[in-house]
Amino acid sequence: MNATAGLPVVGVDLAKSVFQLAVADGAWRIVEQHRLTRTQLERWFANRAVGLVVMEACGSAHHWARWLNGLGIEVRLLPAAYVRVYVKRNKTDAADAGALLEAARLALTSRQCG
């Protein structure tokens, strides 16, 4: 399954006021990282073509998933326990966003996700 169709995949670490994004290319290499406020996040997604967004399932994840679906972006929510094992460094927002991409890559290639 090619969920990205040549478009970037974005891992989003959700937080109360600042969000960390890791953007991967079609080969799942992280090519960009961003730290955005809520307003900046909304503007960023509204102005970008994105193939897939992966987020850790949490309280606000469903709100953001619905909003992103409204923009025509496919969203996958991953259980926190599944993502946690892919954090390779100290736990930071940037590491979490990268771990989301790694977890999604492995889940999509083994068909465990969605």
Positions of PLM-derived features:
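Phosphate- and other anionic-substrate recognition elements at nucleic-acid/protein interfaces
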Residues: 1-114
